[in-house]
Amino acid sequence: MTSRGTPDFCLAYRALPSELKLAARRAYQKFSENPAHPGLRLERLRSNPRAWSVRVTQNCRAVALRFEDDAWVWIWIGSHQDFDREFPE
């Protein structure tokens, strides 16, 4: 498995408060060890069959695109409220 963030993802990550950055790093560690870790609540988005979201905290999610070679490209991170606006079902 490979994984990387887009420039937009990296900008959004850098804008997060430090406690959310720490939570995002912890979530990514779990993801890199086991993408199906129950704490991540990995979910496929109905709007795009390549798009998946993971739970960072109770109020924060991250979105990645998954490709056939098991490459993940992180495209978005933010609040659940913003997630619902950006990725309506």
List PLM regions with ranges.
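Arg/Lys-rich, positively charged N-terminal/basic patches that mediate binding to nucleic acids
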Residues: 1-27
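Enriched for short, Lys/Arg-rich terminal
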Residues: 2-4, 56-89
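Non-catalytic, surface-exposed connector residues within folded enzymatic/regulatory domains
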Residues: 3, 25, 36-39, 77
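Tryptophan-centered motif/residue detector
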Residues: 10, 28, 52, 74-76
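Active-site micro-motifs of SAM-dependent methyltransferase domains
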Residues: 11, 30, 82
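Hydrophobic residues in alpha-helical membrane-spanning segments
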Residues: 18, 36-39, 63
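A short, surface-exposed loop/turn module that caps and links secondary-structure elements
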Residues: 29-54
